[in-house]
Amino acid sequence: MNKLFYLFILIASLFILTDASHFRFGTISWQPTTDYRTIKFTSNFAYRTTFFYSSTSSIKVGNLVNVGTLNFGSGVGSVTVSVTVTDFDVKNNWFTGTFTTTKAYPAQNSGTIREYTAIFTSCCRISSLLNNKDASWNITTSVQIDNKNELSMVNWSPVSGMIPIVQVVANKNNNFRVIASDQNVQNADSSALTFSFSKVYTMTQPSGMTIDSKGNCYFLPTQIGLYSTQIYILDSRGAYIVVDFILQSVAEPGTCDPTCSNAGTACNQNSQCKGCTNSGSTTIDTCTTSNYPPDFVSPPTPDDGDTKLFPIGASTSLTFSCKTIMSGRSTTIQTANLPVGVTTKTPVTGATSNTTITWTPTTANTGSYVVSLVCSDSTGLTSSVRSFTILVAKPDCGNGGYTESGVCKCVDNWDPASKCFECKDGYYGENCVAVPPCVNGVPNSGINGDGKCLCSNGWTGADCSISSSQSCKDLSNSNTSISYSNPSFVNPTKVQVYLTSTPNYEVPTIVSIPNPINNLDVYVLVDANLASTTAFGYIKSGMSTFVSNIENICETAQFGIGYFSDYTPSPISFSPSQVMGSPIAAAIGLYKPATYSTTSNGNSLLAATDAASASVGWNSGSFKVIVIITDSDHSSSSAQITAFTNKFIGKSIVPVVVSFGASSMTNWNSALTSAGFGSVVTASGTSASDWSAKANTGVKNVLSKIVYKSDPTATGSSFVSSVPSTVTVSSSSSTQQTVNGLKLSLPSGTTIVSPVATISAMGYGQTDISINYNRPPVATSGSFSVNQNSLATFKLTGTDPDANILQFKFTTFLTANAGVITDSNGKDVSKQQSNYYAASEIFTYTPFENYLASNTIRFVAFDGCVESNTYATISITINKVNQLPECSSISSTITTTLNTQSTFSMTATDFEDASPFLQFTKPTDLTAYGTFTYKGASITSSTKITTGDSVIFTQTVNPKNDATVTLEFRAIDTSNAFSQASCSVSFKIQHANVAPVSSSTSPISVIPRGSVSLTLVSTDSDSTKALFTITAIKNGNNGNFYTCSTNDCSCTSGSSDSTIISLKDQFSGISYSSTKANKLICFTNGEPSAISNYASISFTSTDDEGLESNTVSVVVNIVGDRANVAPVVTKIQDYSVYQDYLDSDAHVVTGTDADIDDYNPPNVNNLIAIITTPPSNGILVTVQNGNNVATQGNAPFTHYYRPNPGFKGTDSYSYQVMDTFKETSSVESTTVTVNPINHKPTLTVNSYSFTSQSGAGETQTLVTYDFDGDNVLCSVQAAPKQISMYDSENELITTLPKSLSSNSYSFKLLDASKISPTPFSSFSDSFIISCKDDSKLTTPYGVLSTGNVTGFVQFTYINTPPTTKGIQVELDQDTTEPFTFNGTDIESPSDLKAKIYALPANGQLLNGNVVLTSKLIGEETYELDALSYKPNAGLSNWNTIDNIGPLDSIPYSVVDQQGLVSDSDVVTFSVRPRNPPVYTGADVIDVLQNTRYPLNVQGKVGNGGSEVNIQVLKFSGRGTLSIAHSMGSEGTMDTEITSYPNSQTGSTSYNFAYMPPHNEYGNDFDFIEFKLFDGDLYSELYTITVNVIHVNQPPTIQLISYKVLDDTSKDNGEVLFDSTYIVNMNINTSVLIKYTGSDVDVDQVTPLLSTVTTALRGTLYTKDETVPDLKGSIIDRNHTTVEQSSDGYYYVVYSPVPDSSGNSYVRIPFFMTDNGGLDSPTLTAVINVNRYNIPPFVLAGNKTYSTTTKLALSVENVQFDDPDSGKSNNVSIVVSIVGENDENVASLEDIKISLKRMQNCELHTSLASISCLDTKSALNESIQTITVNAVTAGNYRLKLFVDDLGYNAPSAIRAQSHMNATGYVDVTFEEAETTTQTNDNKTVLTGAIAGAAAGTALIAAAAWRLLRKAAPPTDTFFSEAAFLGDGVSSNPLYEQSASAAENPLYQSASDTTD
């Protein structure tokens, strides 16, 4: 059963694959040939066989199949791909084919490599693919054109292959390998390949598939079906290929492995097997099967990945063997991608099968070939894919050559200079045969040549012996000058003939028709108005038989189909349906005619004419026939019959008319008899088989003979004197013969320009004859300009239709004062008025000095026989040259003063302008110090300042020191031309002195009869010395302020070393240190007891420049008075600390005292602790981490010991205690042991600078130090952002941190373009380094780090010269081509100019319309894209020696904006001697409304061209334009073109589909603009006009808007309907609804009828403008129509039932009816009748509160109410403290706020704001008491903001319906009383509130976090007014929120998301 199920799945999947699209597999490889730019491409593709053939057995190895176009890369052309079939698989319906071609790429400059991307792409992939279905395939490879390396070292691409369809098992592990070979076999170091999924074009890789870098694929497909994959294969030199193939996933039932817990259980996939040993493996299945597939036998079969060498010239064979172990089964081997020429034999079949391949490669086959094999058994099971490489190695000597003494000896005609790989001169092709004669040209020789003669300029013919450029007098006989022969039944297809007066010049033609015929196109034109549905049914059912009958005549026949209708009331002349190559039997099966009638307007002949005129996808080189099936004769006029005949002749189409049931076809018989071609057959009309058989007979009739006709509409028809007689086509053998009888004669007196005669061999093809005869030449007008006081050169040009050599003669000359024109000999042409000048003559025009007027001269052309009929004009324009302005520098420096205006002016002069302007280059250098204005506006780098006008600079910035700023400026004239030199003005920005600030400690205390010191302090940032002045002094009764000469207070007041301080005493010369100057003074007293405010002293300080500070006062208080007993000190026990670290334990100096006033623990301890002897090797500090030295202090006196840096050992200090009477205790000492520790190392990082020209920076070494002598190891923690940093080994630092082995580093700038923010500029950057030691100490810690140290690096950018590279400009003959010089500059790539050193020899350079002269190029530089090249008339690449070109070249350099010049290089001009393709289709198409139109665009190859490609440039876009892909029997697939231009290549006929937009029509409806191109040669712009023909359509209706009436709560404006058609109105109001209808039909002339269904609730009225409420008549079941208003709209008024409301209250349907009775779709308005939402309000009992800081303030009785909020819905409030006059929220550092109840509230983290969300009762309880506590005094307001969240509004508009209110309570906090008050508290508070303004938005965020838990967020609620506005905001109920539609689901109250 399992096996049967497996076979069913396998067969089903194969069936699906067979019925799919056609692409299966593809890969492209390449290799250079005899030179670096000639590349040989080898492509392998696989397709579905039945897409190209009628059955899988019809294909044969060696068949040629055209599969598309290979594009060689952007701008270098393409080639049609015709693969040679190499393998095919009958069972799986695919074949593989190989295509080889050679492409010569444009030459590269020496030392350069250019990469192109070759691509083979088309649509569409298989529709049933599980990934990438219906997508385009893109097979690409990167092609390297390498002119840098020797040819032997030039890269070859990889090569790969695969079976087109690889079978895999679903839900199981599938492992296979993609094999590829690196073709660089001539190199000793063959590069490795890497594999990955392709990302060249976007595609989806199979889910569950991976690939490693070696090409091993692992795939566990989870679905049964087809997958596509593309593998990317890259070699080490950057060349890649892809291999694209299909994976077919099939089911394979099995049982679980014995190691599984459910062993033996039936399974279909690995995941169904549980607990297995190999679970999760990517290579071993746990669901196994005993149904084993076949496998290859090795040997003889090559192993996967093997390489087999096939020597050149030797026959080599390989055998493949496959076997199965399953009894009763046989095996077969399928190969893929065999090289062309390999023969295959299969001598053995059965359980074991063998296949042998044999091949004898030639030198042309050099390279690698990846061949793939798969083995399948008779049940459909397949082996894994086996792939190997066939290597044809390139020998030392090719093509039979041999080596003798190290030199190649060649046989036959091979060239030893190429080691026998290239032909000798004069030989061509793979066999090096002799080239045919080539008289005046160069033969296309070489191994890749075709032997054709490439003629030199002026010669033509097969051997280039016929002159095509000569004087007319040299031609005396008629001759055939050019003949083109394309693949066709009739040859030649194009002929060029020169006719003289000799009559009846004969042009021979050849016919070659195979039997059976190989190309047949049949277009079926069906009458869609037959007599009955039964009759049309016969046509449908017989179409398949007809197709089969025709395919019996030609197996590859293609079909198209279209329709016409002869229904008299509404006939249709022609409507195309399917283009050529379509399944017409299926198409007609879906077609439904609109009418069946026996009446006819007889338009079948007109329909046939239109069908022949249309582009229906005819294939080039096919026999073309239109089969017209109709049941009525035509009734056309004679003019229409003539038009029919001419159209069929012009298109070489033959008609076959099938009379379907008609008694006679008299008119058709007559028309075809008169025409002389075509066939009429009669069918019964009652049988499908009869008409199909008769139609087949008609086609055979027209195939049986060749009827020649001359197209009378061709311009050269009058030149045809006779055509050949009818030729009979053999029915049993091929017909090949030369046909005579085509004769031409020159009509007398003809003036036809470029006549072309068309001779049609009806159906089989046609010959176009371009006829030349001597006609007058045409002189070509031109113009040029020359700069004032300069000169210009020019040539005279003209054209001759016969390519005769031209001469020219002047007919008018310059006026006397205009200047002089001289010839190349310097002679004035006005003195030689009868001279003829050659076309190569160069004339020079020199205008007289300062002559500026325009002038013209005239001339005629002469071809040797006649002059041109009209003269041509040369227009001369003299360009006035603008003189640059000049500016003047300001010599004196402008000195500025702070906050003072400085006014100055600048001057400039200009030759043309009286008042030029001036502009500053960089005014920001000055505006950094103040304001810089002109006429009141700030000056920028674009400000234009009139010369002499004043500008003002006001210094507002006080620099630390005086600064000098120099500004550059330039003059600019009215043409925006700048002065060549810059000028300057300098400013001295002066520093302004700042007054000092005085300070001191106050009050200070002193004991009775004691002394105390105090310090006078002055602070100043810009002075060096201070002067202190005593401004007031109060000594007390027994006190004195004094100083000691020892600068301390150790002296006694009144002693010789003391000085008493008096009023106005001064202390001068006090130095500032760290901005502070200190003066120590002393105070002593003789008082016996304590006295408060006993003494005081006031002082100021003055700086160096005399600025005086504020006045500071110091108050002295006297404390203490008693009897005393000496205290006792307490000893501190010895202790230890760590080296260099403060002791972590506090130590205390204290003692005891018998005096209770001094010592009474725990309440009194007035002892003073004194350090009598400080430690010798350390210090004592009072705070553990502080710096204050512990000398004395109140006992207990806490101190910490800090050893001196680096000290270790023992130390000691002594101490005692002193009581308040200065009695001291004895002295005690304590010993401290300092234990050694590890020290942190130090690091110094020096700044470094370098430039862009210094390359890599010099190595920098870090400066490190370790106190302990440890090693210091450093690492980079952060590298510079813009500079590359390298480690000690000079390796780029890419990961951080990075160790520096020798503590050194260096820098290098990799890419100056990435400097940010300004590329190519100088900048500073930083980096961070940290170091650590390697200490062995561990206590108290081990290894220590320096921490992060920042270093700085300065990069200076130095401008570099630009660079250039030669370019090749390609253009068409006789055209002008703009081009762009190739220049690059890393600093300013967009600001380069070109400098030209010489003019082209064979053409002109144009700057606009000005022809460049040697004078111009000597003085000017040009924008890179400013110039165009125009070759001289008639010249092209053919005029060069090798006929390849280029025609011209010029040397040039580029100059950057700094004037640096690049090295010179060359622009070459390659002029193509070809004509573009020509569009042959209709310019206008008629498309039925709402109907797809198959648009086929056909073109003809231009004379001398090779391709017809199309580029759709523009589409007007009202409809849809798509590319139509023919999928064979599957019909067509349309892919919309979404961007333009859109290009297609590889055919002469391109299929599109046009679809008009729904219900739109009209003439000139859409426009399609396109060009045809051949390579990069483009045709003129073609435009197809699309007319969309009207088909009657129903009307449409549109609801416009509504307006609520009777509602006074809001502005009742007009509201536009959205797509929901919802009306929102309030209770007890009415609404006016406005709507309209439209009809696309032009016959709808009366207003549409509006019908409205009666409302189920409420009342509907018509609108009556005469009554106030607008309510007209009631609309009920008897009155449902609404008349159109005078403004063109329709109106109804709706009123709901009074006092009722609700969502979706009522639905009102509307529809329209046209005057034909068609109804529009119905639109329904949904009425929501809503309740009113009442705004909340705020109440406050007391609106003013005041208190002092640091006291809590309770605000009571602040409440709010929302009338329509209930007990359950939430309301939002925000309680905050704001400023007195603004809405800025105060900071928590200034004021704090709290509520009585904080549940469901959130306090802001930094601002005085609380956000709450709860019911209104709960919130009112919360705010019953609001507590406010201010730190900073000031006037505040308590603000309560309430939002009702719109809960009373309907949910649909709740987001827009929030109502809110705001209330305030004033709160004032006075400053608590203090001894001093130096600042205005209000000022401080204002600053504090202003500083908190930025936090206001954060309060909104806090409210949002609460609110979003229970309410939908809206922008109305969270607008700025919600938090900052005063009072109740305006009602937002009817304001549309911009984000109203973005309403998220409510979140639960537990949501804590921020």
Swiss-Prot record:
One protein family per Pfam: SIBA-E_N
Membrane disposition: Single-pass type I membrane protein
Organism superkingdom: Eukaryota
Domain spans labelled EGF-like: 428-465
PROSITE patterns attached to this UniProt entry: EGF_1 (PS00022), EGF_2 (PS01186), EGF_3 (PS50026), VWFA (PS50234)
Cysteines engaged in disulfide bonds, as pairs: 438-453, 455-464
Residue ranges, Cytoplasmic side: 1905-1954
This protein's UniProt keywords: Cell adhesion, Disulfide bond, EGF-like domain, Glycoprotein, Membrane, Signal, Transmembrane, Transmembrane helix
Span of the signal peptide: 1-20
GO biological process, one term: phagocytosis
Gene3D superfamilies referenced in this protein's UniProt entry, alphabetically: 2.60.40.3440, von Willebrand factor, type A domain
Sequence ranges assigned to domain VWFA in this UniProt record: 521-706
Principal location: membrane
Localisation per UniProt entry: Membrane
Extracellular topological segments: 21-1883
Residue stretches spanning the membrane: 1884-1904
Gene Ontology CC entries for this record: membrane
Positions annotated as glycosylated: 138, 354, 479, 1348, 1382, 1628, 1678, 1742, 1770, 1820, 1860, 1881
Listed PANTHER family: INTEGRIN BETA-LIKE PROTEIN E, STABILIN
Protein family per UniProt: Belongs to the SIB family.
Assembly: Interacts with talA/talin.
Function per UniProt: Implicated in cellular adhesion.
Protein name, per record: Integrin beta-like protein C
Organism annotation: Dictyostelium discoideum
